[in-house]
A protein has these predicted regions:
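N-terminal catalytic or cofactor-binding beta/alpha core of small enzyme domains
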Residues: 1-163
Length: 163
């Protein structure tokens, strides 16, 4: 296997030259590519929005492919869409036409799949988002990231020598 890097809007996948480990390293909160539109739609400045990042964790673990394991890095910031949440963790306090199904402390605190707040409970937006906008973010970022993660995990099923 050659050393490859697959890039998508939502993630970057770094493969090792030689696959030696059955572990997939995934970093769903390493994204820091903030669109101008997102920054303009927020009531917060870029520095405050970035307080929700796991800043530079991707650089801390960038050596993983050299150790023989794949590395999946988020490119989208978690303040825009949180890849470490379920796709249906939609916050009715943030997204129009969404109704609460059950009590979920993450959603209640503003940390659903589309976060309403960053650290110290600071609101990201002035008002609510439309449901189509929220679902478009999930389609564009959440699903591709999780498909890539699932594909990497399935790859190990074909390699009994790595189980």
């Amino acid at each position: 296997m050659q050393n490859m890097s697959l890039s998508h809007l939502a993630y970057e996948l770094k493969d090792p030259e030689v696959l030696r480990s059955p572990i997939v390293f995934a970093s769903p909160h390493s994204g820091r590519e903030y669109s101008k539109e997102f920054l303009q739609s927020s009531v917060l400045d870029a520095r405050v929005i970035r307080s929700s990042e796991d800043a530079y964790v991707d650089q801390l673990i960038d050596f993983i492919p050299e150790m023989g394991a794949p590395l999946l890095l988020a490119k989208v910031p978690r303040a825009y869409v949180d890849l470490n949440r379920a796709a249906d963790e939609l916050d009715p306090s943030l997204i129009n036409d969404v109704h609460s199904r059950a009590q979920n402390p993450r959603i209640t605190s503003g940390l659903g799949v589309i976060p309403r707040v960053v650290s110290n409970a600071r609101a990201i937006y002035r008002g609510k988002l439309s449901k189509p906008e929220a679902l478009a973010r999930i389609d564009q970022y959440w699903f591709p990231y999780h498909r890539a993660l699932r594909c990497e995990l399935l790859r190990f099923n074909c390699r009994p020598d790595l189980r």
